[in-house]
């Protein structure tokens, strides 16, 4: 099930302790310095 996360409340298929949504809808922890909340790996992609 998708969970709301990020300031826009976008539905993401995955959940993390620090959940944010990238423009492409990826839900990931805020570990990316350049794009906070965006994961550079595939382990958190939808």
Swiss-Prot record:
Propeptide: 46
Protein's cellular compartments: Secreted
Domain comment, as recorded: The cysteine framework is XI (C-C-CC-CC-C-C).
Keywords in alphabetical order: D-amino acid, Disulfide bond, Ion channel impairing toxin, Neurotoxin, Secreted, Toxin, Voltage-gated sodium channel impairing toxin
Function: Iota-conotoxins bind to voltage-gated sodium channels (Nav) and act as agonists by shifting the voltage-dependence of activation to more hyperpolarized levels. Produces general excitatory symptoms.
Residue pairs linked by disulfide bridges in the UniProt entry: 5-19, 12-22, 18-27, 21-38
Broad class of the protein's primary localization: secreted
Gene Ontology MF terms: sodium channel regulator activity; toxin activity
Gene Ontology CC annotation, any one: extracellular region
Annotated tissue distribution: Expressed by the venom duct.
Entry's family note: Belongs to the conotoxin I1 superfamily.
Name of the protein this chain belongs to: Iota-conotoxin-like M11.1
InterPro entries per UniProt: Conotoxin-I_CS, Toxin_19
Modified residues (D-methionine): 44
Organism for this UniProt entry: Conus magus
Superkingdom of source: Eukaryota
Keyword Disulfide bond in annotation: yes
Keyword Secreted assigned: yes
């Amino acid at each position: 099930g998708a969970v709301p996360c990020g300031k826009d409340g976008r539905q993401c298929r995955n959940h993390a302790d620090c959940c944010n949504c990238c423009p492409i809808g990826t839900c990931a922890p805020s570990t990316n310095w350049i794009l906070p909340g965006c994961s550079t790996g595939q382990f958190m992609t939808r």
